[in-house]
Amino acid sequence: MNDVIRTSSALPHYHPRKLPSLTGLRFVAAALVFGFHASLTKIIGFNPYADHQASHAFKVLFSEGGWMGVSFFFVLSGFVITWSARPDDTVGSFIFRRVLKIYPNHFATWALTMILFGAAVTPASIWLPNLLLVHAWIPKDEVYLGVNGPSWSLCCELFFYVLFPFLLIYIKRIPENRLWMWAAATVIGLFACQSAINLLVRGTPWVTAWPISVERWWLSYFFPPFRLFEFVLGMLMARILMTGRWIGLGLVPAFGLLVAGYIFAMFVPFQFSFNVATVVPIAFLITSVAAADVAGRRTGFAGRTMNWLGDISFGMYMIHLVILTLVTNWLNGRLLGTPAATVLVLAAFGASVLGGWLLFVCIERPVMRRWGKAAPRKSALMGAEV
């Protein structure tokens, strides 16, 4: 298998091979985020199970799903964008296409949320930063979680996109035999950053649902510069695969490592469950799945159905909290028996998938087809050596 990977590394930096399994995995990550939010009894308060054991089991099952799902998206973003970076692309064209990819769905769900829940009561100090995708930079939970909560991660993505062309220049300069060292340094940097926040930022009073203060939660989870480690790790793992330095970890061990990381995250100090406990398994899984695609091996995530689900996963991610809030308001504090509650959770999940599909076919795909194609020029090449 190493020979297959090394053969692929002889290709130029613009790597035309698609990675359909990673598209399919995006849906799994979005489903984990849905399960996490649906299981909450506080903040969102959707968890509809009257039976305490069923409610607790639901919450424990998805207790790390939100943190892991978002971390997966950040690592995946760095990996995929590095993998597909074109040497004839321009910085402006790249950033324009990336903004075009995320902003229309953001605006649509922002407007829907404001119309349904907040137009009359949400002040401009909350809705305007959210609209402009700068709210994750503001250390107030009513701001960084305001309007449509999941949109905070788009602030991080936007920050990553702006930095990517410049990061790529330096990451491409790293000698092949030092890529693993830099990947390890990135993980150590993430751990050191979280440790410093844990030591230097007050931990009380706690937020409503978790044992962490607003300030510490903001810095350790929402603040875009401190999520850059995950994005850069994804970039480095892509370079490791492209240069033939991947260790050849198989899919089964990679998934086993991910499950172990998920369980491990349940027992580490709360703040370290956000990304420190799971970022290495996530990076290894993404690279292992990508390597399988390059080698032409089956993964179970590259089929037509999984790719369709992956295509709509961004829209699903953006609209699922709107669906959960609507159902929570309809429940109005009522709890249901286990069969009825399970049906309701599945119905909300189905509605989120449907909403994601509508966003994809009505907004995301038409916009990208109309304006999202690269317009390469022979100057200002992205990632060019300087």
Model-derived segments and spans:
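Aromatic-enriched alpha-helical transmembrane segments of multi-pass intramembrane proteins
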Residues: 23, 32, 66, 129-155, ...
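Alpha-helical transmembrane segments and their membrane-interface exit regions
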Residues: 281-291
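Transmembrane alpha-helical segments and their boundary/interface "anchor" motifs
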Residues: 22-25, 29, 63, 67-70, ...
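N-terminal membrane topogenic signal
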Residues: 14-27, 178
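Perimembrane loop-to-helix junctions flanking transmembrane segments
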Residues: 48-60, 210-212
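C-terminal "closing" transmembrane helix and its immediate cytosolic amphipathic cap
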Residues: 1-14, 171, 299, 303-306, ...
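Membrane-interface junctions at the ends of membrane-embedded or membrane-associated helices
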Residues: 87-93, 170-177, 239-251, 291-308, ...
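Alpha-helical transmembrane segments of multi-pass membrane proteins
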Residues: 33-45, 194-195
